[in-house]
């Protein structure tokens, strides 16, 4: 399965409201992990198909002027012996602003696993 990323309609609406000066744009603070992917995510989604864990980001890097990378590392204990095939970036209000589905990633119980999620224009 090829990786597919979708910006949610809710995420788009928040950007538009911030640009219009109606509300402030809440920062992305967490990454969600799941194993229920069954195709490309829909822009109307605000939940993973089967969310397993939501975790604070480990870091944020500016890759270029129009690309930020969000990083989250799972410890050995987190989601041990679990398959992961859907991810999301979550803002501080708890909303999913971007969802990505991907091929199965098997998380063993003897290793950390780091996920990177690029947000680019």
Give residue spans per PLM region.
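Small cysteine-rich, disulfide-bonded extracellular modules of the LU/uPAR three-finger superfamily
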Residues: 1-84, 92-121
